[in-house]
């Protein structure tokens, strides 16, 4: 996959990533920012918009905003502290809530497009 400079896709994704990073910087709670990102990803993926704008929002904004590595670091700390129940609860809840958030974003976008 090459960089699509001709259609400004590279620059649009970079702009989305910049905005996503700023948004992520303002939200300190990993769980919340990941749920918001999942909701937005489901919403944006369901919109009938040009591919380059969808890439801007999904890859740039949502990709930059969500924090898989921060979440893994948080889980590792829970394990090191011996908080096994909290580790398991956190692991399961973010996965289940993330899928639910994507589904809700998808449903919301479809209702707006109807």
From Swiss-Prot:
Belongs to the fluoride channel Fluc/FEX (TC 1.A.43) family. Na(+) is not transported, but it plays an essential structural role and its presence is essential for fluoride channel function. It is found in: Cell inner membrane. Na(+) binds at residues 63, 66. Coiled coil: none annotated. InterPro entries: FluC. Its main location: membrane. One of its GO terms (biological process) is cellular detoxification of fluoride. It catalyses: fluoride(in) = fluoride(out). Fluoride-specific ion channel. Important for reducing fluoride concentration in the cell, thus reducing its toxicity. GO terms for cellular component: plasma membrane. The chain crosses the membrane at residues 3-23, 30-50, 55-75, 87-107. It comes from the Bacteria. This is Fluoride-specific ion channel FluC 1. It is a multi-pass membrane protein. Keywords: Cell inner membrane, Cell membrane, Ion channel, Ion transport, Membrane, Metal-binding, Sodium, Transmembrane, Transmembrane helix, Transport. One of its GO terms (molecular function) is metal ion binding.
């Amino acid at each position: 996959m090459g960089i699509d400079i001709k259609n400004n896709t590279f620059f649009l994704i970079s702009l989305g990533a910049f905005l996503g990073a700023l948004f992520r910087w303002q939200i300190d709670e990993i769980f919340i920012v990941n749920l918001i990102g999942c909701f937005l990803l489901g919403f944006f993926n369901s919109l009938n918009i040009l591919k380059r704008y969808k890439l801007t929002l999904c890859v740039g904004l949502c990709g930059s905003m969500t924090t898989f590595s921060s979440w893994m670091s948080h889980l590792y700390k829970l394990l090191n502290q011996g908080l096994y129940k909290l580790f398991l609860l956190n692991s399961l809840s973010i996965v289940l809530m993330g899928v639910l958030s994507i589904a809700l974003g998808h449903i919301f976008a479809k209702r707006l497009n109807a």
